[in-house]
Design a protein with these regions (language model features):
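Sec-exported extracytoplasmic/periplasmic mature domains
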Residues: 15-20, 24-27, 60, 64-79, ...
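Soluble metallo-hydrolase cores and metallopeptidase-like ectodomains found primarily
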Residues: 46-156, 169-172, 176-181
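Metal-dependent peptidase/peptidase-like ectodomains
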Residues: 49-73, 194-299, 313-317
């Protein structure tokens, strides 16, 4: 659950639910050295309209005054697994926030396998993608490392060299089939390595917003029907008990398609309906595009320098890549694209 506990995921969830601001408090059970969060935050929120502040436990308890509850009581319940909804806090909170932006350039890397001699913009293409960025030589605020470990190289073998490797293998396989005359595509396939995922889905969001701006004149416009689907791979290298396929609720096609394509492979699979995820597929789903994300689960090395290549389960990563490749081939050779189903984000998520 560590990837869902990050401030980034919580902020993205709050923003999707229409929050105007986010107040972060550590809580008395957290036993942190400093109660205030570091003065760095998600780059994707720079122009989102959501403000974020960190407060001490004492201030947090003052905000709860009048509700009959304390931070300690609430955190005890959460620590014990008790789910709860929101708490109505009366009053108004005012804060002066100064943001210092540091701008850098990131690059998405895309390639197209056209179904004809040239790419055809009139037929909805399939997207097969994975994020290419990680945390670098010092993990920053997204690192889970402590002490001197923070300044070590964060290799990102599973997160997400494994996913990028899968995209490259699928691209090579399908391109070879087409070259040999063994593949009759009905639509183009776009292979994408997204930048800035760890900073808040920056690369994939830029792509869909720029595309919407170019085609419809509005970066916020929906793109339903403009792309057949988005297949995403984020952390597929540390197979545990089963492969997790997320976003099945985004299309009625996925369940049968997965069962059909997995038959010759035999991977144990766990499915999740929700398409609101802390990964690049969400950028496409929110634009009206059906999505499917492959994920083998979090682990103790997540966002740590210890996420290294020697720990990758290459045999099962290859099986997962084969499955996603077969699904990609099925969509790219079908006359009709998968349908899109609108889902609300889960409550209390």
């Amino acid at each position: 659950l560590s990837r869902y506990s990050s401030l980034r995921y919580k902020a993205l969830t709050a923003r999707q639910k229409g929050a105007r601001g986010l107040i972060v408090v550590s809580g008395p059970n957290s036993k942190v050295v400093q109660q205030l969060a570091p003065m760095t935050f998600d780059a994707s929120l720079a122009s989102s309209g959501i403000a974020a502040i960190s407060v001490t436990d004492a201030v947090g308890d003052k905000l709860l005054a009048g509700t009959g509850k304390t931070l300690k009581e609430l955190q005890d319940k959460l620590d014990n697994g008790d789910l709860m909804g929101g708490i109505d806090c009366k009053g108004t909170l005012a804060a002066n926030i100064v943001i210092q932006q540091e701008k850098k350039k990131g690059r998405n890397v895309l390639a197209v396998l056209p179904y004809g001699a040239e790419p055809d913009p009139h037929v909805a293409p399939l997207i097969v993608g994975a994020h290419i960025d990680h945390l670098g030589s010092s993990g920053g605020s997204n690192s889970r490392a402590k002490g001197d470990e923070v300044n070590k190289i964060h290799h990102g073998a599973d997160d997400n060299a494994s996913g990028v490797g899968g995209v490259l293998e699928i691209a090579q396989w399908l391109a070879d089939l087409k070259k040999q005359g063994k593949l009759t595509l009905k639509r183009d396939i776009i292979f994408a390595a997204w930048s800035g995922e760890e900073l808040g889905l920056l690369g994939s969001n830029h792509f869909v917003e720029a595309y919407a701006k170019m085609i419809k004149g509005d970066a916020n416009a929906k793109l339903t029907g403009m792309f057949a689907a988005c297949l995403n791979m984020d952390m597929i290298g540390r197979f545990q008990k089963s492969l997790v396929l997320q976003g099945l609720g985004s299309s009625s096609l996925w369940a049968k398609e997965i069962e059909k394509r997995n038959a010759p492979i035999g991977l144990p699979i766990t499915t999740q309906n929700d398409a609101h995820l802390p990964t690049d597929s969400t950028a496409f789903y929110l634009k009206g595009i059906p999505t499917l994300n492959a994920f083998t689960g979090s682990h103790a090395d997540y966002h740590m320098p210890s996420d290294t290549a020697d720990k990758i389960d290459y045999q099962n990563a290859a099986k997962i890549t084969k499955l996603m490749g077969l699904i990609a081939r099925g969509i790219a050779t079908a006359d009709a694209a998968p349908d899109y189903i609108t889902m609300e984000a889960p409550k209390n998520s």
